[in-house]
């Protein structure tokens, strides 16, 4: 009976997390695009919309983890897939760093998508947005190397798996899409498509690798 009750509570928590994520994602994406369009002169081509969406997912993940880390009892144990608030407290430093990285990286990706869509009307030029993204990536890499030192064997293996899956997905898409474009069967990728492919593949790899190890199961 206790086991069944625990499973039911776990699935309720998962349903709540999915609902909150869906509402926040759809609402935030709509508001973000609307605000950008309100400036005038913004042409949201599919490539820009996709990259903006990928960046928004990173930012939303960072926001959720950040809120959960800041308030483990009030928010974290309900919003994040953890056993209890104590687990968050134990991992607070790494979770906080991951949260900050996701937030900043997501913002940089959205900025690049917006700057390309807005063109001359953008508050930040595409070149400036690109250099900002490179700086953010440098910081992201530095934080990742710092976190690697404190990872146990499980997290190190998970990180390697994520990298491998990301690379394989990118290679598969590049071969199929590039080959099809060369054969004039479809249009080739736009520059922003390549950026979206890289970070979108990493997002997918995170979920796949975590799911394979049972880390996505309700807790």
Predicted regions, residues:
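Membrane-water interface at loop-to-transmembrane-helix junctions
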Residues: 85-105
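Hydrophobic alpha-helical transmembrane segments in multi-pass integral membrane proteins
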Residues: 27-34, 169-185
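Alpha-helical transmembrane segments
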Residues: 44-64, 120-137, 195-197
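Membrane-helix boundary/juxtamembrane motif in polytopic membrane proteins
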Residues: 150-168
